[in-house]
């Protein structure tokens, strides 16, 4: 895994962030914000899997059908980590699909707790006090 960020990577990250703003538009009681999360993965998958349509469908549907719910302000952190793992998997086949799913699932709870406590409780009280 390299630490350098290319211009193409910056474009993908920017597009993924913009798509992530639509995440709450696709709320479903069973999978919560999974479809919006899959849309945030789309810019990277479009570039890395453009020549492999079957793998593209499989990867996109995996993200669209797995439960996803976290604090909206912390969501780009989870998306960025999963996007980096998907890039490694698509380009080098060095990351397993189950690893990506388990990392995504294990980051949901802590980021929700941090985001809810900081942005919805502490920050609101501090700003209201000022």
Go through the PLM ranges and name each one.
Residues 1-96:
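Soluble N-terminal domains of membrane-associated systems
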């Amino acid at each position: 895994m390299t630490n350098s960020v290319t211009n193409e990577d910056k474009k993908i990250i920017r597009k993924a962030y913009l798509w992530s703003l639509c995440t709450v538009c696709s709320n479903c009681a069973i999978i919560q914000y999974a479809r919006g999360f899959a849309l945030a993965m789309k810019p990277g998958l479009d570039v890395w899997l453009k020549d492999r349509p079957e793998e593209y469908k499989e990867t996109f549907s995996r993200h669209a059908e797995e439960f996803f719910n976290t604090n909206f302000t912390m969501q780009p952190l989870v998306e960025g980590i999963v996007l980096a793992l998907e890039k490694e998997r698509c380009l080098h086949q060095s990351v397993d699909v189950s690893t990506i799913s388990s990392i995504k699932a294990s980051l949901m709870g802590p980021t929700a707790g941090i985001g809810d406590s900081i942005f919805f409780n502490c920050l609101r009280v501090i700003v209201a006090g000022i």
